[in-house]
Curated annotation (Swiss-Prot):
<feature type="binding site">
    <location>
        <begin position="166"/>
        <end position="173"/>
    </location>
    <ligand>
        <name>GTP</name>
    </ligand>
</feature>
<dbReference type="Pfam" id="PF01926">
    <property type="entry name" value="MMR_HSR1"/>
</dbReference>
<dbReference type="InterPro" id="IPR006169">
    <property type="entry name" value="GTP1_OBG_dom"/>
</dbReference>
<feature type="region of interest" description="Disordered">
    <location>
        <begin position="332"/>
        <end position="363"/>
    </location>
</feature>
<feature type="domain" description="OBG-type G">
    <location>
        <begin position="160"/>
        <end position="327"/>
    </location>
</feature>
<comment type="similarity">
    <text>Belongs to the TRAFAC class OBG-HflX-like GTPase superfamily. OBG GTPase family.</text>
</comment>
<feature type="compositionally biased region" description="Acidic residues">
    <location>
        <begin position="353"/>
        <end position="363"/>
    </location>
</feature>
<dbReference type="Pfam" id="PF01018">
    <property type="entry name" value="GTP1_OBG"/>
</dbReference>
<keyword id="KW-0547">Nucleotide-binding</keyword>
<feature type="binding site">
    <location>
        <position position="193"/>
    </location>
    <ligand>
        <name>Mg(2+)</name>
    </ligand>
</feature>
<feature type="binding site">
    <location>
        <position position="173"/>
    </location>
    <ligand>
        <name>Mg(2+)</name>
    </ligand>
</feature>
<keyword id="KW-0479">Metal-binding</keyword>
<dbReference type="InterPro" id="IPR031167">
    <property type="entry name" value="G_OBG"/>
</dbReference>
<dbReference type="InterPro" id="IPR027417">
    <property type="entry name" value="P-loop_NTPase"/>
</dbReference>
<dbReference type="InterPro" id="IPR014100">
    <property type="entry name" value="GTP-bd_Obg/CgtA"/>
</dbReference>
<feature type="binding site">
    <location>
        <begin position="212"/>
        <end position="215"/>
    </location>
    <ligand>
        <name>GTP</name>
    </ligand>
</feature>
<dbReference type="InterPro" id="IPR036726">
    <property type="entry name" value="GTP1_OBG_dom_sf"/>
</dbReference>
Length: 363
C-alpha cells in the first residue's frame, strides 16, 4: 500500500430543509389552521479514527465530501427527514488543520475518537410554529439554514513507542526487519527507506511498536535530501533509538549531525529519552570496534550499545533497554487536559457515543 501522510480535503455539511406553509383541509372544518411542518436538519461531516489504517492514501482519490441536505417540511405537521452524515475514516494519530495548515482543529490519538468538522444547517420552522393568538393563519415559513463548508488538511503522525533515527544506511531498516515481522526495503544505497515503516517488537513477552523513518543528512531541516518532514512520525514516541553505523569513518561526527537536525526540527525531540547504539559492528575487528565505541561514547556522553542485526549481538539488550524506558514513561505519563471545545463540537469515544446518535437531530 502506498504511503501518504498529508492530504487536502474539501468538506460541506448539508443545508437544512425549508419549513412548510400548509393549512389543514378537511371536510366540515372551515378554518383548520396552519399545519406546516419543520424542515429536516442537514447532515454533519465527521472524522473518526479507526484501527487498520496507517496511510491517508484514500484521500488522494477522493478529496470532496458532502453530507446530504435535510428534506423540506410537509403538511399535517410532518417534519422533514434529516440529512445523512458523512464520516471520514482516518488512521489513529491523524491531526486535522484549517486551510492555513497551522490552526489545529483536533488531534485523534485513540481508536474511536470522533469530531464534528462541519455541522449541518438547522431546518426552517413551518408556518404552524408561528401561530399566535393574534395571527391564527400565518402564511410564511423559514428557509433552512445553510450548511458549513471548508477546506481542511489531514496530517498523519504515526503512533509508536520507539522511533529509529540516524543517517541513511545506518541499519535502521535492517534492525526493524530483524526484531519485527516488518519487511521494509533494504539495500546498500542511501535513502532506501522513502516512507515510515512500523513493526511490533517483542522482548521477554512484552510488545511495543517501533517506527523506522527515512535517514537524515546534514541540512535536512533546510530540505536537503528528503528533508525532515518524516520526523513528525517520531514526535509521539516514548524513546528514540539513535543508530550510528560502524562503517562511518567518523562516528562521533555522524552522531552530532543527526543530533543537530533533531534540534533544528524542534518539537521537543531532543528532550526525549535516547538510546545510542553502534550498529553493523560485524564489519569491524575488535580493535577497531573498541576505538569507534570510545569515539562515539565521547560524542554522546554515554556508553553506546554495540549491535549487529546479522549476528544478533547486542540486539536483546537494546530491546530490553527500550522496553524499560517505555514502561517507565508510560507509568509517569500525566493525563492530558481536555481541550476547550466550541459549542456543539465534540470529541467522543465510540463507547461514550452509544445511544446518543439522535441527540442532535432536533431542528
Amino acid at each position: 500500500m502506498k504511503f501518504l501522510d498529508e492530504a487536502k480535503v474539501y468538506i460541506r455539511s448539508g443545508d437544512g430543509g425549508a419549513g412548510s406553509v400548509s393549512f389543514r383541509r378537511e371536510k366540515f372544518i372551515e378554518f383548520g389552521g396552519p399545519d406546516g411542518g419543520d424542515g429536516g436538519r442537514g447532515g454533519d461531516v465527521w472524522v473518526e479514527a479507526v484501527n487498520g489504517l496507517n496511510t491517508l492514501i484514500d484521500f488522494r482519490y477522493q478529496q470532496h465530501f458532502k453530507a446530504t441536505i435535510g428534506t423540506h417540511g410537509m403538511g399535517r405537521n410532518r417534519t422533514g427527514a434529516n440529512g445523512s452524515d458523512v464520516t471520514l475514516k482516518v488512521p489513529v494519530g491523524t491531526q486535522i488543520f484549517e486551510e492555513d495548515r497551522e490552526t489545529m482543529i483536533c488531534d485523534l490519538t485513540e481508536e474511536g475518537q470522533r469530531y464534528c468538522l462541519a455541522h449541518g444547517g438547522n431546518g426552517g420552522f413551518g408556518n404552524a410554529h408561528f401561530k399566535t393568538s393574534v395571527n391564527q393563519a400565518p402564511d410564511w415559513a423559514n428557509p433552512g439554514l445553510p450548511g458549513e463548508e471548508k477546506t481542511i488538511w489531514l496530517r498523519l503522525k504515526l503512533i509508536a513507542d520507539a522511533g529509529l533515527v540516524g543517517l541513511p544506511n545506518a541499519g535502521k531498516s535492517t534492525f526493524l526487519a530483524s526484531v519485527t515481522r516488518a519487511r521494509p526495503k533494504i539495500a546498500n544505497y542511501p535513502f532506501t527507506t522513502l516512507h515510515p515503516n512500523l513493526g511490533v517488537a517483542t522482548v521477554d513477552e512484552r510488545e511495543f511498536i517501533l517506527a523506522d523513518i527515512p535517514g537524515l543528512i546534514e541540512g535536512a531541516h533546510e530540505g536537503v535530501g528528503i528533508g525532515d518532514r518524516f520526523l513528525g512520525h517520531v514526535e509521539r514516541t516514548r524513546v528514540l533509538l539513535h543508530l550510528v553505523s560502524a562503517q562511518e569513518e567518523k562516528v562521533g561526527k555522524a552522531y552530532k549531525t543527526v543530533k543537530h537536525e533533531l534540534e533544528a526540527y524542534g518539537n521537543e525531540l531532543t528532550d526525549k529519552p535516547e538510546i545510542v547504539a553502534l550498529s553493523q559492528i560485524d564489519v569491524l575487528d575488535e580493535a577497531e570496534l573498541k576505538k569507534k565505541t570510545k569515539e562515539l561514547a565521547k560524542a554522546c556522553g554515554r556508553t553506546p550499545f554495540q549491535i549487529s542485526a546479522v549476528t544478533g549481538r547486542g540486539m536483546t539488550e537494546v530491546l530490553r533497554a527500550l522496553r524499560d524506558i517505555i514502561v517507565q514513561e508510560n507509568a509517569e505519563e500525566k493525563p492530558a487536559k481536555a481541550p476547550k471545545l466550541r459549542h456543539r463540537d465534540m470529541i467522543v469515544s465510540e463507547e461514550n457515543n452509544q445511544g446518543e446518535d439522535g441527540a442532535d437531530d432536533q431542528p
